[in-house]
UniProtKB/Swiss-Prot annotation:
Changing E118A: Abolishes endonuclease activity. Keywords: Bacterial host gene expression shutoff by virus, Degradation of host chromosome by virus, DNA-binding, Endonuclease, Host gene expression shutoff by virus, Host-virus interaction, Hydrolase, Magnesium, Metal-binding, Nuclease. Its cofactor is Mg(2+). InterPro entries: EndoII-like_GIY-YIG, GIY-YIG_endonuc, GIY-YIG_endonuc_sf, Host_DNA_Degrad_Endo, Phage_T4_DenA_endoDNaseII. This is Endonuclease II. Contributes to the degradation of host DNA, permitting the scavenging of host-derived nucleotides for phage DNA synthesis. Sequence-specific endonuclease. Catalyzes nicking of the bottom strand of double-stranded DNA between the first and second base pair to the right of a top-strand CCGC motif. Does not cleave native phage DNA, which contains 5-hydroxymethylcytosine instead of cytosine. GO terms for molecular function: DNA binding; endonuclease activity; metal ion binding. It comes from the Viruses. It catalyses: Endonucleolytic nicking and cleavage of cytosine-containing double-stranded DNA. The gene is denA. Pfam families: GIY-YIG (PF01541).
Length: 136
C-alpha cells in the first residue's frame, strides 16, 4: 500500500484499533471531505471507495456490524472487525478530490473528480472487497 500511496498521492488517515471491549475505538482526528479512500490490511490494499465525509464513513464501519439490515458496508464492517480481532493492522488512506469548473458561452459546468477517480482506481488495482466492480 505504501507504494500506491506514494505514487497516487494517498495519505495515511488513521489506523483502527480495538478497545478493551473488542469494539473499534472512536476516532479523534480532523475530518477529511470529498476523498477517495483506501482500506489496507497489513499493508495490502483491500478496498477503494469514495465519500464526502471520511470520519463519518469510518464511524459507520465501526457500528455497521451491529445493524439488523445488512448492507455492503456491514459486510466490510464485519471484515474489518475480524481483521482487527486476528491482530491485523487496518489502515485508512485518503486522496483529496476537487470540483473542476469550466465556463464557456453556454454557461458553467462543474465536474467532481471523485466520480471520475474512484472507478479508475478500482479498475487499476482490482481490490478484493470491490465486488460490485468485478467482471461477471
Amino acid at each position: 500500500m505504501k507504494e500506491i500511496a506514494t505514487e497516487y498521492s494517498f495519505i495515511k488517515y488513521t489506523e483502527l484499533e480495538l478497545d478493551d471491549n473488542g469494539s473499534i475505538k472512536q476516532l479523534s482526528i480532523p475530518n477529511k471531505y470529498n476523498v477517495i479512500y483506501a482500506i489496507a490490511i497489513n499493508d495490502e490494499l483491500v478496498y477503494i471507495g469514495k465519500t464526502k465525509n471520511l470520519r463519518k464513513r469510518i464511524n459507520y464501519y465501526r457500528t455497521a456490524i451491529n445493524r439488523k439490515d445488512k448492507t455492503s458496508d456491514s459486510t466490510k464492517s464485519a471484515l474489518i472487525h475480524s481483521a482487527l480481532k486476528e491482530g491485523s493492522k487496518v489502515e485508512f488512506y485518503a486522496r483529496q478530490c476537487f470540483n473542476l469548473s469550466m465556463t464557456n458561452e453556454l454557461g458553467t459546468m462543474t465536474i467532481a473528480t471523485i466520480d471520475l477517480e474512484e472507478p479508475l482506481f478500482i479498475k487499476l488495482f482490482n481490490p478484493p472487497w470491490n465486488i460490485q466492480h468485478k467482471k461477471k
